[in-house]
Amino acid sequence: MAALTKADMAERLYEELGLNKREAKEMVEAFFDEIRGALSHNEQVKLSGFGNFDLRDKKQRPGRNPKTGEEIPISARRVVTFRPGQKLKQKVEAYAGTQS
């Protein structure tokens, strides 16, 4: 399975929208900067037809060092979660159905 990179996205903008390569790269960077900025200000990011990025606070919990077996605390932290939207779920399920 190949991965879609930011460079790939910029290349598609260049090919499909006729932006020059610098503009395409800047547009992709600006898109991700907006998402990062919103999340850093504790805002939810909703992309219609794609999904939602949310912030979740995780409490401190006990963990274990896999090498030594020693119990160590895993500190409380904030994590980014992604919940796919219905359209994305349907596309993935339809694609997965053609791969069997």
UniProtKB/Swiss-Prot annotation:
Q: Which CDD domains match?
A: IHF_A (cd13835)
Question: Which keywords does this chain's UniProt record carry?
Answer: DNA recombination, DNA-binding, Transcription, Transcription regulation, Translation regulation
The reply to whether Lipid biosynthesis figures as a keyword in the UniProt entry is no
Gene3D superfamilies, per this entry? IHF-like DNA-binding proteins
Give the Pfam families listed for this entry: Bac_DNA_binding (PF00216)
For molecular function, the Gene Ontology terms on record are: DNA binding; structural constituent of chromatin
Q: Which InterPro entries match?
A: Hist_DNA-bd, Histone-like_DNA-bd_CS, IHF-like_DNA-bd_dom_sf, IHF_alpha
Segments carrying the region annotation (Disordered) are 53-72
Q: Which GO terms describe its biological process?
A: DNA recombination; positive regulation of metabolic process; regulation of DNA-templated transcription; regulation of translation
Oligomer and partners: Heterodimer of an alpha and a beta chain.
Protein family per UniProt: Belongs to the bacterial histone-like protein family.
Name of the protein this chain belongs to: Integration host factor subunit alpha
The organism named in the record is Marinobacter nauticus (strain ATCC 700491 / DSM 11845 / VT8)
Q: What lineage does the source organism belong to?
A: Bacteria, Pseudomonadati, Pseudomonadota, Gammaproteobacteria, Pseudomonadales
